């Protein structure tokens, strides 16, 4: 490997810049491994400048009519370099309209001398005029003819998420497009499940990045808890909400190591596991991003923190990754005896599994189980259900001319993987194209059966419609003439209804749960859930007594003009029941007094005495100690 980069082996958390040749650019996984061998991962961020002869797309003059369904106005509050950010949904608009808005006097980039001057203006402008971000648009602008570093076909081990579990999460294992303007911001965060990410700036003004080295990530978390105590109390992993902005000045004053780098059009930025990053756009631009994984990530994924309030929880089972790529520790991990320690300093690859042969080992196990072989995903991607606004195809049709790839003979493999623990076994992947969809998974198949495409958990549950396509057909982006752009952006449709989800790799103790809510749609209880063994019971051993002098407040919701109940303002307090075995227990609106017939027995007199002294709530708890609604009154006991 003779690739040129801008600094020697990284020992000081410097953000490295790499200049691969066209030959080196051909193998994405190999080049990422080379970058880590040079210490690029220690900074948490690296830049890759592709060869001059490489192009992601020949031209971008045919994307003006792509629809941005949900533009987000970024409103900030705070002072002294510490701000919180929230989003207001705006009316849908075309990319051409968004470009015109971004270049208008109200939103255009202010005059500046250089990047450093613009950076100072950025932090001084908060709160200021809130910009509008065209973020999280499911789709890709890479042409099918682009084989190297095509974000829709990276071919990393993250493909196992769909191949083994049948799970597609938009923005995680499918690309997202981002149309930005001056001051649009991505707040401090790590990637979902602490994955890698790659960001390509297709065209437009630069993007400035800040990053904290992974080995100092916990220091940033401690500082954030001090600066945002309210958010921290509400959620242990509140940084995953992407609402916290902390300026470089504040980081310096608190001794948090960080680096900055400016990305320009035609350049890639790679973030590494547990690398906290943030940044802003200098003006109108278009970027594309997706997550990916390497064997080194698996240990990070095992211990990745999660949003505890459920607002930004994106998680999936690590079973397939550990079982296939770390078979020597699978049994220990399955019984929660695998004491994983993440080494932020040195890249680690399991000795028994090299990155280059994981696809062959999957094929070997499938062949041993008597299933049809899986088409190699380096040259062919699975068929998925997609939304109408997905991957761009200006001509509106046509089949993908993706060459096939024969699976290599595996008789010389040194070991055979254990069979899948999933209820329906491993999925058969087939089909071509670049299907993208917010939470729409390629349907898993059993041998010899044909099923409809399933919808799996969405990354943020903001999809407004579903569609499907025949195998070999390109999905379509939604254009302005296909929707009414003068209407407000649609809100979430509410709780998703899961159809059949065979092929899921949930823990075995979750697989038989049921029955389904809809008898006409038999379904598994949801994709890739953790085992019930890991769920700690929160029921107290003794139910506290509530004396009659304590007033128990009940939650009352107001009605609208139509007489319907209004939703609570804080939607985070509403428990979203995503799975068929969950049911909502209604809170009673009043307490019924228990009547006791006259009885001369000592037991009856004792019951009457307790009823008078401690009230009906205590009696209800005695009758049924596990009844859930009296437990809601515990906080009122003083």
Swiss-Prot record:
Residues the entry annotates as binding Fe cation: 189, 191, 277
Cofactor(s) needed: Fe(2+)
Source organism: Homo sapiens
A single GO BP: regulation of gene expression
A GO term, aspect molecular function: histone H3K9 demethylase activity
SMART domains reported for this sequence: JmjC, JmjN
Metal-binding in keyword set: yes
Record field: catalytic activity: N(6),N(6),N(6)-trimethyl-L-lysyl(9)-[histone H3] + 2 2-oxoglutarate + 2 O2 = N(6)-methyl-L-lysyl(9)-[histone H3] + 2 formaldehyde + 2 succinate + 2 CO2
Domain of life assignment: Eukaryota
Keyword Mitochondrion in record: no
Protein name: Probable lysine-specific demethylase 4F
Family the UniProt entry places it in: Belongs to the JHDM3 histone demethylase family.
Keyword tags: Chromatin regulator, Iron, Metal-binding, Nucleus, Oxidoreductase, Transcription, Transcription regulation, Zinc
Subcellular location: Nucleus
CC terms in the record's Gene Ontology section: chromatin; nucleus
